[in-house]
Amino acid sequence: MKNTLFRINELSKKEKATGLTVDEKQEQQMLRQNYTQTFRGSLDSILLNTKIVDQNGLNVTPAALQDAQIRLKLSK
């Protein structure tokens, strides 16, 4: 993922400085799309394994998140 982000930034700098070729522009779009999918997947994984508890020890996880967690457990 670090290499992908490095390449995205490298292409962005080049785009600002001199512009990109058609191939580089396609590569940039593909890298950004892949990076976004990976990032969202990681965030989903983190959220689906999160439980929110108030200072009294009560589970205050939002209902929508609890529903998603239940659906995930049922699909496994």
Swiss-Prot record:
Q: Kindly list the residue ranges recorded as spanning the membrane.
A: none
Q: Which Pfam families match?
A: DUF896
* Principal subcellular localisation of the protein: cytoplasm
Gene Ontology terms: cellular component: cytoplasm
Entry protein name: UPF0291 protein BA_1897/GBAA_1897/BAS1759
Gene3D superfamilies associated with the record: Helix hairpin bin (1.10.287.540)
- Alphabetized UniProt keyword annotations: Cytoplasm
Entry similarity comment: Belongs to the UPF0291 family.
Its organism's taxonomic lineage begins at: Bacteria, Bacillati, Bacillota, Bacilli, Bacillales
Localization, per the record, is: Cytoplasm
